[in-house]
């Protein structure tokens, strides 16, 4: 069990580091940038295989938590979290004032809907936790688990649990990509060619270094 948890933590940490590597804070001036990549996605549906990692690495997807460059667990779309003594109830406070890249507010209700979509559609979720239900209580999201999980915050740092806007038509998400909260948003996607992401004008966490990035 400990080895499985450690692997999940390392995987989530790597995903967070890849995202930060794509989005430097002060190296590049505004404009366009081209980055060569060796790993591509067949689809931008985040629940398919491990393609959520690509979505996060491209600076589009974000989750409730993340790992910093030193491997420390830090807040992202959640500002804080607590757990019950039995480890079966986890409460995450959702960051206020965050918008998706289309300008829609990221509400706790939409966070819940996004997570429930992932839980319903991905067969990888049981590798992380055994969920009973998710509730909204004001600005909080409450996870009710069937079994105790001491590493719930680490599990949610995995890109699989990125938060996307489920209030819009996502019928063509495989090509359009999810609408998320990261510094960039998808402009175009070619599974056998280039992918272009553009600056998210609603980004909540500081300046975005480039107008667009071609990958």
Regions found by a protein language model. Give the residues of each.
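Bacterial N-terminal signal peptides that target proteins for export
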Residues: 2-13
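Hydrophobic core
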Residues: 14-22
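Sec-dependent signal peptide cleavage junction
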Residues: 22-32
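Short, well-ordered beta-strand elements
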Residues: 30-40, 89-92, 111-114, 141-143, ...
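N-terminal lobe/hinge region of extracytoplasmic solute-binding protein
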Residues: 36-85, 179-180
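Aromatic- and charge-enriched surface segment that lines or borders ligand/interaction sites
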Residues: 79-121, 142
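Surface-exposed binding/hinge segments that line
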Residues: 126-167, 188-190
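Gly/Pro-rich hinge or "lid" segments in bacterial periplasmic/extracellular proteins
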Residues: 157-208, 212
């Amino acid at each position: 069990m400990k080895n499985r948890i450690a692997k999940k933590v390392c995987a989530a940490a790597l995903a967070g580091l890849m995202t930060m590597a794509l989005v430097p804070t002060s190296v590049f001036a505004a404009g366009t940038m081209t980055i060569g990549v060796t790993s591509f996605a067949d689809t931008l549906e985040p629940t398919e295989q491990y393609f959520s990692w690509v979505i996060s690495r491209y600076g589009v997807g974000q989750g409730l938590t993340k790992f910093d460059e030193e491997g420390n667990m830090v807040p992202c779309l959640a500002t804080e979290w607590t757990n019950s003594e039995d480890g079966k109830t986890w409460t995450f406070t959702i960051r206020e004032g965050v918008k998706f890249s289309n300008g829609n507010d990221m509400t706790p209700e939409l966070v819940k809907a996004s997570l429930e979509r992932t839980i319903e559609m991905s067969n990888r979720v049981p590798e992380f936790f055994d969920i009973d239900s998710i509730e909204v209580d004001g600005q909080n999201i409450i996870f009710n688990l069937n079994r105790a999980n001491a590493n719930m915050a680490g599990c949610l740092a995995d890109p699989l649990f990125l938060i996307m806007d489920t209030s819009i038509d996502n019928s063509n998400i495989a090509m359009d990509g999810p609408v998320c909260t990261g510094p960039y948003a998808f402009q175009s996607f070619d599974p056998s060619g280039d992918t272009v992401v553009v600056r998210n004008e609603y980004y909540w966490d500081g300046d975005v270094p480039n107008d667009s990035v071609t990958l």
